[in-house]
Regions:
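ABC ATPase NBD Q-loop/coupling interface
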Residues: 62-79, 139
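Conserved ABC ATPase "signature" region
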Residues: 68-69, 115-136
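Conserved catalytic motifs of ABC-family nucleotide-binding domains
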Residues: 162
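Catalytic Walker B motif of ABC-type/P-loop ATPase nucleotide-binding domains
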Residues: 166-169
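Helical segment within the ABC ATPase nucleotide-binding domain
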Residues: 180-192
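Conserved H-loop
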Residues: 194-199
Length: 251
């Protein structure tokens, strides 16, 4: 479980996340939607402490993953990033072979013998429905794959180090419909063993894949009930009107 307790994130005097108190349950998918610049990506970066070295970045309150406050002074950021995997908008593959891309992180963090690498590679590539497509091409450069395949490869590399939490920052925004459907199916298959936070601009997608949908507006999170119809506000970035009757996470 991920827990925010009166959490605020700010850059100098500008508060991006304000007084957030909310729980994201384990073994489920929570989708986060909101206007551009509302702080969605900042919230993801907070969970793996990617903003630590940004000048004037500061926090108040606490964030707990599995009951551990990740911003305690004695918190081990290296161990945190083993527990939290993040997938970005555009696939991030290295100019190495498909095989080497999968085991990239394993070499550093997993206690596994090199002789077991092939079995691990097959296992995670099967998990992301990519094995049958690449099993005869493992020595080829990962950059020869399509974008959809590269995104699944990125996810396979993340799964290889066995994270508890998966953070998905609009992972299908640059993909075609077929690849998007493949990623959505894949993430659904992973939710029983991971806490997943999926950021998207696509409201229909959020409601179709997530167990819970939250809206981030002006630094505050509001719930979007599955029974609440979403009416897109073409002339305003505000989501307030469609959330008047929603209940769930307090502001």
């Amino acid at each position: 479980m991920i827990q925010f307790k009166n959490f605020t994130a700010a850059f100098g005097k500008r508060k991006v996340i304000q007084g957030l108190t909310c729980n994201l349950p384990e073994n489920s998918i929570t989708a986060l939607i909101g206007a551009s610049g509302s702080g969605k990506t900042t919230l993801l970066r907070v969970l793996c402490r990617m903003n630590d070295r940004i000048e004037n970045f500061r926090i108040e309150g606490s964030v707990l993953i599995g009951g551990t406050d990740i911003y305690r002074p004695d918190s081990n950021v290296y161990l945190l990033r083993r527990r939290v995997g993040m997938i970005f908008q555009k696939p991030c593959v290295f100019p190495k072979s498909i095989f080497d891309n999968v085991i990239f992180g394993v070499r550093e963090v997993a206690k596994i013998s090199k002789k077991d690498y092939p079995d691990l590679v097959e296992k995670v590539l099967r998990e992301v429905f990519l094995w049958e497509e690449v099993k005869d091409r493992l020595g080829e450069k990962a950059t020869t794959l399509s974008q959809g395949q590269q995104q699944r490869l990125t996810l396979a590399r993340t799964l290889a180090v066995e994270p508890e939490v998966l953070l998905m920052d609009e992972p299908t925004s640059s993909l075609d419909p077929k690849s998007t459907a493949a990623i959505e199916k894949l993430v659904q298959s992973l939710k029983n063993s991971h806490t997943i936070l999926w950021v998207t601009h696509q409201h229909d997608q959020a409601k179709s894949i997530a167990d819970r949908v939250l809206v981030l507006e002006e630094g505050r999170v509001r719930p979007l009930s599955p029974a609440t119809p979403f009416v897109r506000q073409e002339k305003s970035a505000s989501f307030t009107n469609v959330l008047q009757d929603a209940q769930g996470c307090p502001e």
